[in-house]
Design a protein with these regions (language model features):
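Sec-dependent signal peptide recognition
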Residues: 1-7
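N-terminal signal peptide c-region/cleavage motif recognized by signal peptidases
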Residues: 11-15
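N-terminal maturation segment of proteins
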Residues: 18-581
Length: 581
């Protein structure tokens, strides 16, 4: 009887033990479906076609609803005991909890009404819509047109929110808005065929579409540009000139806005995934800046210059470091990238299948944006990753920065990490939606250092370029916290960047504008890179001759983008496993 009772206990205990795991996986499925529903254009790029004719809802009511729904997910998540989950699901739970908590917290700040920065905005994101969608069938083109035709409603919503933001004191500083107007006016195309929105209709006709229907689709697209999109962008331009720009903020700091200090503290936590304070980060930046300055001094003297400053003057002004056409800059960039491609197997055991391409940054945004950026592709939609290069102001785009820049943006940096994440056997929300700046950008900055192993920094100028990029990210820690927590002005920030990096004036201006208009984001780079370098040093010391750099890199990338404490735990577990091999 006792044995039978024990057997009954075991039989009934199994479902009870499984219940929390089942509840958790059900929550994961519902949460992922929610993410797709709230991100209809991204869902299309992932191959989910349920929302093909929809665009995102930017409204504050939608923000409030999403915050409530995130809070409901969070309550359900907290009711599931962590101890009942597998080690893998405990990591999923921790990452999901952080993401949901940040969604709820972000919605409490008035800064949610600030819908654009000097780097991006709803109007710029929509102008790049075609870059992220498949165009293989007639249905693809029809759904794209349906989305274009909804832009005036999105634009009106965004302008209403921005008008409220102006009334309540959430406005970008005057000092950063010099190039913002062009990001609006540059999208307006008098000839619809030359519009960015029309570009998909210049491609070969889809196989399932006859000539007459294709001609009709092209006519509909021209109509959309002329009668739908151009008027919406013109309305935005008029609003910007008459209702936004005259009310731009005099202070460069987000702390001057209502609730700004609390908002900045949130942004620091969010972007670094740490509990570091602005003051602690500022001090780290000063130490790193001093260390890198000393290295730059050594390189300058070895190159025959009397000082670091003398070498930097030469790097900024010597014509031999610059090209005169966009095509030449893209060619030099492509040469570096193909060289790196051939060296990747020596540093990584697993490489992504998705390729990447190189394109110039669109003209309407190039003059006011950064040197380069990466846009992920989509294996499901047959879209390669894209490394965008700034080909404006060519006298400010030196060749010596191309190796470090390319390592960061393409491979082994962003493309390698993100395209690999898209292939990993992770919970779908982590595979497709999770990106922590401290990891993603920390990895990109760490990837620049791998140019040493690859032999790319083979001249003093290229080595100085790498060190300047290191100094640039160290300076971000000083400048971002200086502006938003310590009362610095833009002029102080620009001077610190000039004194501590070899960046050209155009780059410095664009970068400082970015830090001012996007508080905290720039902190993740150096904080993340320092953690990855520290973990590599820990592994090298612990494993000695057993340390395998390829296996270390594969381990760092094996879980996709994660908070830094999760990364540390996974590397420590790998070190223990390697010791036992």
């Amino acid at each position: 009887m006792r044995l039978a009772f024990a057997a009954l206990l075991l039989a009934t205990a199994a479902p009870v033990a499984a219940a929390p795991a089942d509840d958790f996986h059900r929550l994961l499925d519902e949460h992922y479906a929610w993410l797709l529903r709230e991100s209809p254009t991204y869902a299309t790029s992932l191959g989910v076609r349920d929302y093909d004719r929809q665009i995102e809802d930017l409204g504050l009511a939608a923000d409030d609803r999403r915050s409530r729904e995130a809070g409901a997910f969070l309550a359900r998540l907290d009711a599931i005991p962590e101890t009942a989950l597998s080690p893998e699901d405990r990591v999923n739970r921790a990452i999901l909890r952080r993401s949901l908590s940040e969604t709820v917290e972000a919605n409490r700040f008035g800064q949610r009404m600030m819908l654009f920065t000097t780097y991006a905005g709803w109007h710029q994101n929509f102008a790049g819509l075609a870059d992220n969608l498949p165009f293989r069938t007639r249905a693809d083109y029809e759904s794209y047109l349906a989305r274009l035709e909804q832009y005036p409603k999105m634009n009106d919503t965004a302008l209403d929110i921005t008008a409220r933001a102006v009334r309540e004191g959430y406005v970008l500083p005057c000092s950063v808005l010099g190039n913002s107007e062009k990001t609006i006016s540059g999208v307006i195309a008098e000839d619809p065929v030359k519009s960015r929105f029309y570009e998909p209709f210049t491609r070969p006709r889809p196989a399932d579409t006859n000539e007459a229907d294709w001609t009709a689709l092209q006519a509909r697209a021209r109509h959309a540009v002329t009668d739908v999109l151009n008027p919406a962008y013109a309305k935005h331009l008029a609003f910007y000139r008459t209702q936004y720009l005259p009310h731009c903020a005099k202070s460069d700091s987000v702390s001057a806005q209502p609730g700004g200090r609390d908002y900045y503290a949130f942004r620091v936590r969010q972007e670094t995934t740490t509990t570091l304070t602005p003051e602690e980060i500022h001090a780290i930046g000063l130490r790193e800046s001093a260390r890198i300055r000393a290295e730059m001094e050594k390189v300058a003297r070895a190159a025959g210059f009397p000082s670091r400053e003398a070498f930097i003057r030469d790097l900024r002004t010597n014509p031999r470091y610059f090209v005169t056409t966009p095509e030449a800059l893209l060619k030099e960039t492509a040469l570096v990238n193909k060289t790196v491609d051939g060296k990747m197997p020596g540093l990584f055991g697993r490489l992504p299948r998705l390729p990447y391409g190189i394109r110039p940054i669109p003209a309407e945004t190039a003059e006011g944006t950064t040197t380069a950026y990466y846009q992920p592709g989509s294996p499901a939609s047959g879209i390669a990753g894209t490394y965008y290069v700034n080909t404006s102001k060519l006298d400010q785009r030196p060749l010596w920065e191309i190796p470090a820049l390319s390592l960061h943006e393409s491979v082994p940096g962003h493309h390698n990490q993100i395209a690999l994440q898209q292939e990993l056997e992770l919970a779908p929300f982590r595979r497709h939606f999770t990106s922590f700046t401290a990891f993603t950008e920390g990895w990109g900055l760490y990837a620049e250092s791998l140019g040493e192993e690859m032999g790319l920094y083979d001249t003093p100028a290229k080595k100085m370029g790498q060190l300047s990029y290191q100094a640039w990210r160290a300076a971000r820690l000083v400048v971002d916290t200086g502006i938003h927590a310590m009362g610095w002005t833009k002029a102080q920030a620009v001077q610190f960047m000039r004194d501590n990096t070899a960046l050209t004036d155009a780059n410095i201006d664009a970068e400082v504008n970015r830090y001012i208009s996007w508080p905290g984001q720039a902190l993740g780079y150096k904080i993340g890179e320092l953690k990855i370098r520290a973990l590599r040093a820990r592994a090298e010391q612990a494993l000695g001759p057993k340390f395998d750099l390829r296996r270390f890199h594969d381990t760092v990338l094996a879980q996709g983008s994660v908070p830094l404490d999760v990364l540390e735990a996974q590397v420590d577990a790998w070190i223990a496993a390697e010791k036992a091999r």
